[in-house]
């Protein structure tokens, strides 16, 4: 699983929550995540949208390209947002599957990760 965000602290917090589900995580800043997407094809990506949900906009086209190449909806994309809603109601890229509102806690994020993994 790839965790992307500008804040190193948020990346660590999110990675620790995800690791509770038994997943290995790689954490990257938005500017270095592009290179990581070329190296690996993660099944799930968690993006921290920042204050305006735009911190990771530069990755959206690459994510959509990965989906096109795989012929599926993988990688799944979770956006961590300051606003609650659906990707559609927040006018987000079609690359975003699920929005999780901040503050990020294990009680909010872990069930979403488990659902994507098909464990719920």
Describe the role of every protein-language-model region.
Residues 104-113:
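C-terminal output helix
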Residues 46-73:
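Conserved phosphotransfer microenvironments
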Residues 70-85:
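A short, hydrophobic beta-strand element within the central beta-sheet of small alpha/beta folds
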Residues 28-44, 48:
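Acidic, metal-coordinating helix/loop segments flanking the phosphotransfer/catalytic sites
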Residues 57-58, 83-99, 111:
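Alpha4 helix (beta4-alpha4-beta5 surface) of REC/receiver domains from two-component response regulators
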Residues 8-26:
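Two-component/phosphorelay signaling modules centered on CheY-like receiver
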Residues 4-5:
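Conserved acidic carboxylate
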Residues 45, 99-100:
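Two-component signal transduction core modules
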